[in-house]
Amino acid sequence: RAIGKAEEELGNGKKLYCLGDIVHNGKECNRLQQLGLETIDHDTYNTLHDANVLLRAHGEPPSTYKKAKENNIHIVDATCPVVLHLQERIRKEYTADTEHRKQIVIFGKNGHAEVLGLVGQTEGTAIVIESPEEVERLDMNRDICLYSQTTKSLDGFRTIVEYIQNHISPDATFKYSDTICRQVANRMPHIREFASRHDVIL
């Protein structure tokens, strides 16, 4: 989706920036660079005015869109629809909790672009846990709403859910949303089986 949007914009002769690598594939990034796509970071993005910028599938926090309005940046939004829906759910949960009594928890990798976009929906207040072992950081006497980065392990998510269910106070509520992308999750058994038959995978 992101590649198609980039090719369309570049094919129309427009100068196009991409906020971060468009895909995790150096060869494809180089091909698009030859077509005119320029990859930038957030520091460079914040200095742009009157430019066209593509947002990749991982999504962005609200601050990125705010800066676009301020600097007259045209956004070509290639955010994955699954990620957009997840952002909206987290944002609604956060804004509905006016007294900020709930812990909004995201099972994900700190610093990952998707996770930064999700945390941004909560004005930076969401708690990120990278592994089931970190679930002990949560306050089991307070309400918990659990979400997941779309590409995390389904087994890890289930382990976290089970731990919270077994330890949360009777006076607190626990809600969770399995937001793991099935296209990714369904690949994992095949990848494990494939890996078991080979010594090295490039």
Task: Name each region found by the language model.
Residues 1-201:
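The feature marks the mature, well-folded catalytic cores of soluble enzymes
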